[in-house]
Amino acid sequence: QAIDHTGLDVERNYHRYRRPLSPIIVRFDAETARDETAFAKFISDLTGARVEFSSSREESVEQLVARATGKVRWLSHEAAPQTALLAKGVSLDKRPIAQRGDIEVPRWLLEQSVCITYHRYGNINGGPKPVCPGLK
C-alpha cells in the first residue's frame, strides 16, 4: 500500500515498499539459529518476497556468488564474499536478524518513492496526468 504523508494539494508524494524481482538468497550454516531461518521464512511468506536458502554444507561460497543476482542475506558465521558480490552488483546484508518487524521487514523489500506533480508553472491541474498502478 502506498502512503502519502505530505497531504499537499498540488503534489502527491507516495512512499511504498515493493517485492524484489529476483529471489533473495539467505546463507546459513550449522551455527545459525533455527529461529533465524524460521523468521526468514516467515518474512518471505508475509511479504511475498521469494527466498532461496543456501546451506554451507550443500553449496560453496563460490557457487553462491556465481548464481546470486539480486540480494544476499548473510546469516552464516563464515566470512561473507563481500567484494565478489559487490563486483557483480549484488547487495549483501550481513546484519543479524532484528527482533522488531518494523526494522526487519523493510530489509527484505525495495523502498520506492513516487512523486506526482499536479501543477505546471504554478497552474494547478496544468501538468501531465500520469497513471501509476497501485497508487490512488
Each language-model region and where it sits:
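C-terminal segments
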Residues: 1-136
